[in-house]
Amino acid sequence: MPVALRVVPCLDVDGGRVVKGVNFLDLRDAGDPVELARRYDADGADEITFLDVSASTQGRATTLEMVSATAEQVFVPLTVGGGVRAVADVEALLRAGADKVGVNTAAIARPELLTEIAQHYGNQVLVLSVDARRCPDGVVTDSGFEVTTHGGRTGTGIDAVEWAAEATSRGAGEVLLNSIDADGTTAGFDVEMIEAVRAVVDTPLVASGGAGTVEDFVAAARAGADAVLAASVFHYGTLTISEVKAALRDAGFEVR
């Protein structure tokens, strides 16, 4: 029996509020994270992702109280990311109610962190979060995609596809692939990026960045995504989770 494709709303949280911008800039308020999580759970979300978007740039841990309040309201798995720099941070988030923990910036600086987390908690808990972009002028990688940090503001010169492969070999049980170029644009997922990462990882792949129409979700699934993540189209009522699932089902994909 095929594994059902997951539809995942994303809560980008800053200062206790859900925010959304374009290419991680010009953030505007989108609501209360606890209320939105409750709504998406009721609307049929398969999982919910909670990203503290300013934790890494501000050098602090994710706000545990907000994670706990959100986890108490939902009955689907909750992935939490932002500001995870040590095994102890993972422990704190799991105790607060997270089911999976996303690691991004800290793992780039010290890839061994992925191995340590996987050894402590198992790879099913560990999500590698990759904010990737097409290489700008002056940057060359084999795949044409570069890993960025700090909300897409800082290039690393690291090949995004090679990094995804290394991270899964170190124990990441899932890859959350976010296109910085497409993020918030509603112009469609970066299908080529999804295909490139799909070719090198066997773990579940979550596609993020750019969803605008139900056809975009179908395109991401056809490119090899096991889950499709979106924020603004759900926050602002452009699409419902049910509409996305209906389109995926009509395209021949198994959904819950």
From Swiss-Prot:
InterPro entries on file: Aldolase_TIM (IPR013785), His_biosynth (IPR006062), HisF (IPR004651), IGPS_HisA/HisF (IPR050064), RibuloseP-bd_barrel (IPR011060)
Cited Gene3D superfamilies: Aldolase class I
GO molecular function: imidazoleglycerol-phosphate synthase activity; lyase activity
Reaction(s) the record says it catalyses: 5-[(5-phospho-1-deoxy-D-ribulos-1-ylimino)methylamino]-1-(5-phospho-beta-D-ribosyl)imidazole-4-carboxamide + L-glutamine = D-erythro-1-(imidazol-4-yl)glycerol 3-phosphate + 5-amino-1-(5-phospho-beta-D-ribosyl)imidazole-4-carboxamide + L-glutamate + H(+)
The UniProt record lists the keyword Cytoplasm: yes
Primary location class: cytoplasm
Cytoplasm found in the keyword field: yes
Segment forming the signal sequence: none
Enzyme class: lyase
Active site residues per record: 12, 131
Pathway assigned in UniProt: Amino-acid biosynthesis; L-histidine biosynthesis; L-histidine from 5-phospho-alpha-D-ribose 1-diphosphate: step 5/9
A cellular component annotation (GO) from this entry: cytoplasm
Domain of life: Bacteria
Function of the protein: IGPS catalyzes the conversion of PRFAR and glutamine to IGP, AICAR and glutamate. The HisF subunit catalyzes the cyclization activity that produces IGP and AICAR from PRFAR using the ammonia provided by the HisH subunit.
Alphabetical list of NCBIfam families matching this protein: hisF (TIGR00735)
Assembly and binders: Heterodimer of HisH and HisF.
Name the UniProt record assigns to this protein: Imidazole glycerol phosphate synthase subunit HisF
Native organism: Beutenbergia cavernae (strain ATCC BAA-8 / DSM 12333 / CCUG 43141 / JCM 11478 / NBRC 16432 / NCIMB 13614 / HKI 0122)
